[in-house]
Regions:
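Acidic/polar, glycine-enriched structural segments that form the non-catalytic walls/loops
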Residues: 1-61, 95, 136
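Secretory-pathway/luminal and periplasmic proteins that interact with or process carbohydrate-rich
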Residues: 14-20, 98-104, 209-216
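Aromatic-rich carbohydrate-recognition surfaces in CAZymes
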Residues: 63-189, 202
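Extracytoplasmic, non-cytosolic globular domains
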Residues: 182-213
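Conserved small/polar residues in nucleotide/adenosyl-binding loops
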Residues: 217-224
Length: 224
């Protein structure tokens, strides 16, 4: 049991790799055209991470598996076992957005993959802030970046229909996902004292109720 336990702990650290070199340079592949789950016509850049007063990079840049559903496991475990990792990863994800506009779902080689759906990085970043672990990026800047990604054109992948009705047509699962991410963002807004944003995203998180008619015992997707 001890061997299995520590092997499983090791497993949760796999799938993430630093991509910045010893001199702080890293590849930026965020400038391109989305083609399904991939990016084409990429204009590759080399960027350099800022350093602190001691000459160390302020954080590292990472590749990672997609963060889809990690709010149920990895986000919690990292905060307990490796509290520096939610901070590191949050700073890295926000810098991806500073470079390319979008917060990646699963950053790859310094760029985007568009694997899975929604904006699964939001619960991770909010968790880092609400646990008092966010040290390497500005919380307000992180919030504004996530807010932009929760609007049409952002990584969350919603449209005007969702803004008006609160749910994703023909998809109860994606409705719950978007609602949960909106709820998470609302919690950070509360802590930051942004009452209007907390109310806005809090209200958006209630859209799932429209898919739960009293005559049913489960959520039912609306066709329109």
């Amino acid at each position: 049991q001890r061997t299995k336990f520590y092997t499983d702990l090791w497993h949760v650290l796999l799938g993430r790799h630093k991509i910045d070199d010893v001199n702080g340079e890293y590849p930026d592949l965020t400038d391109g055209q989305r083609a399904g789950s991939f990016t084409r016509d990429i204009r590759v850049k080399t960027r350099t991470l800022p350093r602190d007063a001691a000459g160390r990079v302020v954080h590292h840049m990472y590749n990672s598996d997609a963060f889809w559903l990690t709010q149920w496991n990895l986000n919690v475990l990292w905060g307990l076992g490796w509290p520096e990792m939610p901070d590191e990863m949050s700073a890295s994800l926000i810098r991806y957005a500073d470079n390319g506009g979008l917060i990646p779902r699963g950053p790859c080689a310094g760029g985007y993959t568009y694997i899975m759906s929604g904006c699964p990085a939001t619960p991770l970043i909010v968790s880092a802030y609400n646990k008092g672990l966010m040290r390497k990026c500005d919380p307000m800047h992180a919030f504004r970046t996530m807010q932009r990604n929760h609007m049409p054109g952002g990584m969350q992948g919603i449209g005007e229909f969702y803004l008006e009705h609160g749910y994703q047509p023909k998809n109860a699962g994606m409705t719950i996902e978007s609602n949960f991410q909106d709820w998470a963002l609302a919690q950070m807004a509360v802590r930051l004292g942004l009452e209007d944003k907390a109310a806005y995203f809090g209200n958006r998180s209630h859209g799932w109720r429209k898919l739960y008619p009293v005559s049913y015992t489960h959520l039912r997707a609306h066709e329109t």
